[in-house]
Amino acid sequence: MPQLDTSTWLTMILSMFLTLFIIFQLKISKHNFYHNPELTPTKMLKQNTPWEAKWTKIYLPLLLPL
């Protein structure tokens, strides 16, 4: 059974990392970033809930007979 030749693996792995690094650098360099990002003011609308419109009573549960 022949022995597996691993002498070129280091070269292949390093060249792969270098290629991936260059590809990602090129992709990032073509990305358009905003120069001065500003927050857009959001107007908070208050929603009226039914229990805020009128006063409601909270009743205790009925007592059970002993």
Swiss-Prot record:
Subcellular location, principal: mitochondrion
Membrane as UniProt keyword: yes
GO MF, one example: proton transmembrane transporter activity
Location relative to the cell: Mitochondrion membrane
Modified residues (N6-acetyllysine): 54, 57
GO cellular component, one term: proton-transporting ATP synthase complex
Gene Ontology biological process: proton motive force-driven ATP synthesis
Quaternary structure note: Component of the ATP synthase complex composed at least of ATP5F1A/subunit alpha, ATP5F1B/subunit beta, ATP5MC1/subunit c (homooctomer), MT-ATP6/subunit a, MT-ATP8/subunit 8, ATP5ME/subunit e, ATP5MF/subunit f, ATP5MG/subunit g, ATP5MK/subunit k, ATP5MJ/subunit j, ATP5F1C/subunit gamma, ATP5F1D/subunit delta, ATP5F1E/subunit epsilon, ATP5PF/subunit F6, ATP5PB/subunit b, ATP5PD/subunit d, ATP5PO/subunit OSCP.
PANTHER family, A to Z: ATP SYNTHASE PROTEIN 8 (PTHR13722:SF0)
Protein name according to UniProt: ATP synthase F(0) complex subunit 8
Biological source species: Bos indicus (Zebu)
Encoding gene per record: MT-ATP8
